Amino acid sequence: MLTAFARAFRTPDLRKKLLFTLAIIVVYRVGTHIPIPGVDYKNVQQCVREASGNQGLFGLVNMFSGGALLQITIFALGIMPYITASIILQLLTVVIPRLEALKKEGQAGTAKITQYTRYLTVALAILQGTGLVATARSAPLFGRCSVGGQIVPDQSIFTTITMVICMTAGTCVVMWLGELITDRGIGNGMSILMFISIAATFPSALWAIKKQGTLAGGWIEFGTVIAVGLIMVALVVFVEQAQRRIPVQYAKRMIGRRSYGGTSTYIPLKVNQAGVIPVIFASSLLYIPALVAQFAGGNSGWKSWVEQNLTKGDHPIYIVTYFLLIVFFAFFYVAISFNPEEVADNMKKYGGFIPGIRAGRPTAEYLSYVLNRITWPGSLYLGLIALVPTMALVGFGASQNFPFGGTSILIIVGVGLETVKQIESQLQQRNYEGFLR
């Protein structure tokens, strides 16, 4: 692997792409440390230290921003608005016929959907930025903080608007940086930035576990977390690469004087066909009642119930609800992202068939049957991986700081494999051996 990486750097155009990607990553990481106007940065740092790694409802967004959310920087929202906008557009494509037609128009339709995604990203950034500023002003962003009311000293409307504009502009810059990587660098730009954002939180989280540990100065807990993380990475790589291959044969066709077809191929159905989307959906849905309860006044019974049962990661109700939501969204997302009838129609149109299965409706029913069977273990795997921080480290009392959570590991492994395969394909075009043998 190291030899292949060295060969990639020795290839002029690949080296240029890799260096360009690294330069964009440096710019992105610098932006995550530039505070927005109107924030008392010293008080923010004090609140972050007092939070002791427990970031409450904002932990997921803080992870996707590379720790910039709790620092209240110009990149505080990170790529979360873009991720949310992409998911919403993907869901609306199934519901709205106009968007579905655009999706089938090829490159022109994809460009139009990308434009809609950008517009929705800006709108979501304004909403999320306004919510973040309001939360920072009232201080529940950090939980209990001794200087909470002094995070935003000037609470005028002008200051609030300025902060929201800065964070929205920061989101637009992040989106632009991601597109630059996609066009001129290596890999998918937004995926690379997501990878860097998550990886950037690992060192501080690992060191916090070491500092909070009690066995051998915290080194036993530290080593245990590293070991669990490596095992999880190996498990996720194994499952993410696993797939059920449905054999497909194409009949020979005579067009003019030439014969076409007669080849054999397969349809790869991954065990984890839904990817990390169900985990993000479940996390977002669980945050809604907790977020409403956090800003609701009074001490009503439902607010107390939500705070006791849906905000604590080690509570049985939270664990069961989270697990069931992940399983449900896994089936839901697979159902809207993979259309067996469309695949069967395309196969029939081009003379393809599955051996032993008639073309048309029987093929669609067979694909649905196989997909449902492999989605069950895939959804259970997602649920168990997502609950590892709670189940594995609750004994150490450090589950809030556990960096190798389900969402982070799934994204890092997925993006890593995708990027390595892209570099490998470019190396193979130049007759070099790749990373994966």
Swiss-Prot record:
Disulfide bridge positions per record: none
Superkingdom of the organism of origin: Bacteria
Stored InterPro entries: SecY, SecY/SEC61-alpha, SecY_CS, SecY_dom_sf
Pfam family, one: SecY
Residue spans crossing the bilayer: 19-39, 69-89, 122-142, 157-177, 189-209, 219-239, 276-296, 316-336, 378-398, 400-420
Cellular localisation: Cell membrane
Keywords from the UniProt entry: Cell membrane, Membrane, Protein transport, Translocation, Transmembrane, Transmembrane helix, Transport
Keyword set includes Metal-binding: no
Keyword presence, Transport: yes
Cellular component terms (Gene Ontology): plasma membrane
GO biological process, one term: intracellular protein transmembrane transport
Record note on quaternary structure: Component of the Sec protein translocase complex. Heterotrimer consisting of SecY, SecE and SecG subunits. The heterotrimers can form oligomers, although 1 heterotrimer is thought to be able to translocate proteins. Interacts with the ribosome. Interacts with SecDF, and other proteins may be involved. Interacts with SecA.
Family of this protein: Belongs to the SecY/SEC61-alpha family.
Function in brief: The central subunit of the protein translocation channel SecYEG. Consists of two halves formed by TMs 1-5 and 6-10. These two domains form a lateral gate at the front which open onto the bilayer between TMs 2 and 7, and are clamped together by SecE at the back. The channel is closed by both a pore ring composed of hydrophobic SecY resides and a short helix (helix 2A) on the extracellular side of the membrane which forms a plug. The plug probably moves laterally to allow the channel to open. The ring and the pore may move independently.
Protein name, per record: Protein translocase subunit SecY
Organism: Streptomyces galbus
Taxonomic lineage: Bacteria, Bacillati, Actinomycetota, Actinomycetes, Kitasatosporales
